[in-house]
């Protein structure tokens, strides 16, 4: 898959802000960032309130996703350009959602909000309202989603890529240092997992490293390109960024994101765990 199939540059984005059938969507870890200024015409998706089921621990289902995108004015045949802060951390998470529910034309803004601001490009504070559509999501494509039993069965047979920080991987902490630390019952990592922090795939300006640099990064960490791969982190957002790199940029086959990640796995009774680096 060519990079142009899944990424757009900030130059392209600024030239296509008002292009027909093109919708810019901001998704941030800091859900208030959009309100301080956003790309002109972009709509907001809140990863906490829009993409998560309000009762059970799971994503919104196809019906809920259809309702959400219809209300945001996104149609099935629109080109969706996703972007956000922190090297597209949650924008990649949303990209994976869109692919899970079968949206055909979705891309990331390479570098996200960080690159846009480094370029000194304009932000808008205007409220964005688009005409409502009748979006219809497909049934979820679980070929890109891993569940806990599959993850346990993958130990010793598939690539397991832990994309958290070295301190999370080794068991020193349970979550990124700026977040609460009571997210799971036990620290550590899945036995046999390799540790490639998600952020190593990005340059200083938030853009993705070259395919050659990315391939070298994972090969040197011990990833076997002939095997199936499951990526995980704490709640599935950082690992969706790695899923994007491996499947969409490098073209690996059979790559899955384990969105239950460590907050599920680290609380399972009897699940094998390793500590240390």
Curated annotation (Swiss-Prot):
- Tell me the InterPro entries matching this sequence: Rhodanese-like_dom, Rhodanese-like_dom_sf, Thiosulfate_sulfurtransferase, Thiosulphate_STrfase_CS
| SMART domains in the record | RHOD
The catalysed reaction is:
thiosulfate + hydrogen cyanide = thiocyanate + sulfite + 2 H(+)
Q: Which UniProt keywords apply?
A: Isopeptide bond, Repeat, Transferase, Ubl conjugation
Rhodanese domain mapped to chain residues = 18-125, 154-274
Cross-link Isoglutamyl lysine isopeptide (Lys-Gln) (interchain with Q-Cter in protein Pup) mapped to chain: 67
Transferase recorded as keyword: yes
Question: CDD domains given for it?
Answer: TST_Repeat_1, TST_Repeat_2
Report the record's disulfide bonds.
none
Q: Report a single Gene Ontology molecular function.
A: thiosulfate-cyanide sulfurtransferase activity
Residues binding substrate are 238
Q: What is its EC number?
A: 2.8.1.1
Q: Active site: which residues?
A: 233 (cysteine persulfide intermediate)
What the protein does comes down to: May be a sulfotransferase involved in the formation of thiosulfate.
**Domain topic, free-text comment:** Contains two rhodanese domains with different primary structures but with near identical secondary structure conformations suggesting a common evolutionary origin. Only the C-terminal rhodanese domain contains the catalytic cysteine residue.
Which protein, by its recorded name, is this? Putative thiosulfate sulfurtransferase
In the record, what lineage is assigned to the organism producing the protein?
Bacteria, Bacillati, Actinomycetota, Actinomycetes, Mycobacteriales
């Amino acid at each position: 898959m060519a990079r142009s199939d899944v990424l757009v540059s900030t130059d392209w984005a600024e030239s296509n802000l008002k292009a027909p059938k093109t919708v810019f969507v901001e998704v941030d870890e800091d859900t208030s960032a959009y309100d301080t200024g956003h790309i002109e015409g972009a709509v907001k998706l809140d990863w906490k309130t829009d993409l998560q089921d309000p009762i059970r621990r799971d994503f919104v289902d196809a019906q809920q996703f259809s309702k959400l995108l219809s209300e945001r004015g996104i149609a099935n045949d629109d080109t969706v350009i996703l972007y956000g802060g922190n090297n597209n951390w949650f924008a990649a998470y949303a990209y994976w959602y869109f692919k899970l529910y079968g949206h055909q034309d979705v891309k990331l803004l390479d570098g996200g909000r960080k690159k846009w601001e480094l370029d000194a490009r304009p932000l808008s504070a205007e409220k964005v309202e688009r005409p409502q559509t009748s979006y219809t999501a497909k049934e979820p494509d679980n070929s890109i989603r891993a569940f806990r039993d599959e993850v346990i069965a993958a130990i010793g047979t598939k690539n397991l890529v832990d994309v958290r920080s070295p301190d999370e991987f080794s068991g020193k902490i349970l979550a990124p240092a700026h977040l609460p630390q009571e997210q799971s019952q036990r620290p550590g990592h899945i036995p046999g997992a390799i540790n490639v922090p998600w952020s190593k795939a990005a340059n200083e300006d938030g853009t993705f490293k070259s395919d050659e640099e990315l391939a070298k990064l994972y090969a040197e960490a011990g990833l076997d390109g002939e095997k199936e791969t499951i990526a995980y982190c704490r709640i599935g957002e950082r690992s969706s960024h790695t899923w994007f790199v491996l499947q969409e940029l490098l073209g690996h086959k059979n790559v899955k994101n384990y969105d239950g990640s460590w907050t599920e796995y680290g609380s399972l009774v009897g699940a094998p765990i390793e500590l240390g680096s």
